[in-house]
Amino acid sequence: HARLAADETFTRRVAPTFRPDKYLEPAAGGWTGLLARLSEVSGCDATTLDGFTEAMENRRAYFKQLGAVSSDHSHRDLGTIILDHDRAASIFDASVAGWATVEEMTLLRRHLFTDQARMASEDGLTMTVHPAVYRNHDAAAFHRFGADIGSDVPVTLEVVDSL
């Protein structure tokens, strides 16, 4: 984005998009490593729920400062929930420690996703949601280009009750 913005021959506007998906997925491999990186770039301790929330707000502000107008979200479902802070913090801590159940991590993801909506209502980034996609299905493309490169395949999704 920065190179295109600095290129005087490129006359279109380029706006980055905030993509927090992988940081909201405690059940995904490598999540604690992502929290370490998030802590590093945000200057916040993202290994606690409060620190994670502060780090997310920090990164959203950073992207907005760079010209972002939206955040982009893609999860397996549209489930949303607002957990009591103590319950969410407890599940977050258990997820960091590696002993949260799959059910608890799903609740946490839904809570963190819902909190992104709160942040969007406060910072003005439009929340773009494209759920229910099967990613990385093409082994050759995955090995050549890496994870999450597009070519997603839609899967069945319940919408009304989730929201």
Give the residues covered by each predicted segment.
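Enzymes and membrane/adaptor proteins characterized by extended Gly/Ser/Thr/Asp/Glu-rich
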Residues: 19-39
